[in-house]
From Swiss-Prot:
It comes from the Bacteria. The keyword Signal applies. Mg(2+) binds at D68, D70, D198. The keyword Secreted does not apply. This is Class B acid phosphatase. Substrate binds at T136, G137, K183. Binds 1 Mg(2+) ion per subunit. It is found in: Periplasm. It comes from Actinobacillus succinogenes (strain ATCC 55618 / DSM 22257 / CCUG 43843 / 130Z). Belongs to the class B bacterial acid phosphatase family.
Amino acid sequence: MSLIKSSVFMFSMLTIAVSANAKGPKVSYDHAGITAIDHKNEAQVKWVSAESIQKELKGKPPITVSFDIDDTVLVSSQCFYYGKQTFSPDSLDYLHNQAYWDFVADGCDNYSIPKESAKKLIDMHQARGDQVIFITGRTPHRLHKAGQMDQLARILERAFHIKNMKPINYTHDKPIAPYKYDKTRFMVENRVSIHYGDSNDDILAAREAGIRGIRVIRSATSTNRPLPLNGGYGEEVVEDSSY
């Protein structure tokens, strides 16, 4: 077995065995790729940038683009690290604990760090007149009402200077039939053309929705492990997007 095929195989096994929170069907990688700490196959990745995407879209009418939140636009591992240590030190049960999500919704993201790469992408899209929305697997506060502009929405609006900010689309990490992935429904309902995300399910949901899914690199300091294989499905990857 070649080194590249061996690497893809090993990452596939890790993805299937360890990805505990995402609910969509697991799909093995079929391409070589990179992580934030391993770039040996970077020559085989389909790299894109805010500039290259802007050129591709030149002359086309405005579109709707969606962004995942955690590890895509915000460095928010501190919220998850604290949550695990506080609510379930020995498991991932905290992710299913409403008290934890209430803690996050009550302002934890005031301490999250906006990613520079996300700012560049969002600035580019807004300069074109595109509508930016956010889709997250998080669970909102127990008192949250669908369609409500909550604290997270205001934090993102300020951090990225979002025009015509829309309420956050919360999936509760639960796919809704007939879709297999939790974010697909929101991509379809909002007529999204491009989705940016760091997880495998971001890319697979975009494919299920029949739209363009572009990978953002998860930071090496993220507590969300294992790090995904960026480009592992042959998808485009945003260069220098780990920060």
